[in-house]
């Protein structure tokens, strides 16, 4: 997957393709997308959203939600050891009371952007729930699945994460 038609640059938003059920997380296109996104946008577990010129002056840090999208891709592809390692890195970015920012500096880990950021917290909770379910054998690693539907199905069945 690429950022846009005719653009070869990576965009972390393409990690959402499996999350919406378009392709399975272990499909070759999904796996290749993870490889390309990591190669072009990752710095020690932190992902920039994209690095192409968008016309906005100044730079941005790595977006925590993007790193959690990566964690979800690893989890749903059955790469649980890698997912665990990434989660350990991401958990270090919370402050002394466990709050997370929108972004982080890839060198220092310093919180950047909106703080606290609800999207980062939502992604943290969902990623931990998916990883826990995967470790308990409650997520199938074959076939496409809308991650949100999985969560709703579990709640309706009385099996919250």
Report the location of each language-model feature:
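Extended glycan-interaction surfaces of carbohydrate-active proteins
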Residues: 1-63, 85-116, 122-136, 140-161
